[in-house]
């Protein structure tokens, strides 16, 4: 990763890397708060520029939540999904700024996000379905023989636990890879700059690295957007599976088609 700013202090008894991560988390939250404030201005006057982008992002996430969770239940999760997307996306982008690191490039941050999502889906599922009905859905339909439902229950439960691992490591791995690639290009540019004029080969390497860096930055923005979107959309899918009964969702879809 690109060399981070050197800190002359630490907080909470953490080392320098941990302190930087905490500072980046705080910076991330402040930027997200500003974006939310910016989006709220559009309610008071005609939105333009960045406000349109914020509004479009919110509408896209809400529409996707409607299609996955259902129009009846989705609104209760709008705020969670939008804030989750903004926090991860902004956190991913922070690492593109020289001297700063993405908070999502820390495994402790991505694991915390994944565990938080998993606990929330369980909380919602238990609250809305009840203990018996919630755990029963892991065993499959009642029409399935009991000899199959018992092992299926444990397989599905293990699969549910594995979501935390896949969510956290997918985000962590992609963001770290992005920052490592940028770090390599920066090293090439800064390392070969003093001797560019002395060697044709070094000059070629420097030129290639200098051209690739803007492209890699744009690629980093794209990766940041995709990873934030994937994390958020998977969260919506997990909520739909845990907290919304298939019968309610199916009947809602039928009513929607009838109304159409």
State each model region's role.
Residues 1-260:
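Selective transmembrane helix interface/packing segments
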């Amino acid at each position: 990763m690109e060399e981070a700013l050197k800190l002359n202090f630490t907080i909470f008894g953490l080392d320098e890397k941990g302190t930087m991560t905490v500072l980046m988390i705080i910076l991330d939250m402040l930027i997200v708060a500003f974006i939310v404030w910016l989006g709220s201005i559009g309610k008071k006057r005609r939105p333009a520029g960045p406000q349109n982008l914020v509004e479009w992002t919110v509408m896209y996430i809400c529409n996707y939540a409607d299609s996955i969770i259902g129009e009846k239940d989705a609104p209760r999760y709008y705020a969670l999904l939008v804030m989750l997307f903004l926090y991860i996306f902004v956190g991913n982008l922070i690492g593109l700024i020289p001297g700063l690191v993405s908070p999502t490039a820390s495994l402790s941050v991505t694991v915390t996000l994944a565990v938080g999502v998993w606990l929330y889906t369980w909380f919602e599922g238990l609250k809305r379905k009840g203990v018996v009905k919630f755990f029963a859905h892991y065993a499959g339909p009642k029409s399935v023989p009991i000899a199959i439902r018992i092992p299926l229950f444990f397989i599905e439960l293990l699969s549910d636990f594995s979501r935390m691992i896949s969510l956290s490591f997918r985000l962590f791995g992609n963001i770290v890879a992005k920052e490592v690639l940028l770090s390599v290009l920066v090293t090439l540019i800064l390392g070969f700059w003093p001797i560019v004029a002395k060697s044709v080969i070094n000059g070629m390497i420097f030129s290639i690295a200098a051209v690739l860096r803007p492209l890699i930055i744009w690629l980093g923005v794209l990766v940041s957007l995709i990873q934030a979107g994937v994390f958020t959309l998977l969260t919506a899918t997990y909520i739909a599976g845990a907290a919304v009964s298939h019968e309610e969702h199916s009947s809602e879809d039928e009513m929607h088609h009838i109304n159409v």
